[in-house]
Amino acid sequence: MVNERRFNNAFFKGGSTSRLELEVLNSLYGELSSECFSPINGENFVFSQTKPFDLIELEQLLQSVGWSRRPLRRVRRALDNSLLKVGLWKHDPKFPRLIGFARCTGDGILEATVWDVAINPVYQGSGFGKKLMTYVIKSIKEM
């Protein structure tokens, strides 16, 4: 379940985050989720290590940054063999949108390599790439 400290009171405009709101966030993004403070007023973003990726949505994100299309079965296999996968989602209770992605491979103890870092071009230049990398590095260190 989402820890109340991970989603602060600023996440919802109404003030404090209720238990029901935390349950909704948990159901949308999984237990390893946290708010990404947004430089864009009125929009909320969430990092998640546990929300499953829609492979087509992920490939659309990667193509939007200029990468060539890859077979979905290979993408699935790469995800399955990754040490860490992080999605950055534009929060919408009905339809969260993937706007950023990164994954890591490694031995889980000493070494890790970051791969496939992408931020939707609409959100580039707003600091989301730096926020994503900061989150990834922090998550790897906590493993």
Language-model features, listed with the residues they occupy:
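Conserved acetyl-CoA pyrophosphate-binding loop and the N-cap/start of the following alpha-helix
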Residues: 123, 127-135
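N-terminal mitochondrial targeting presequence
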Residues: 1-34
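Short amphipathic alpha-helix that is part of the acyltransferase structural core
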Residues: 22-73
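Alpha-helix N-capping/helix-start residues
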Residues: 52-55, 121, 130
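A conserved beta-strand-loop-helix scaffold within acyl/acetyltransferase catalytic domains
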Residues: 74-118
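Conserved GNAT acetyl-CoA-binding A-motif
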Residues: 133, 138-143
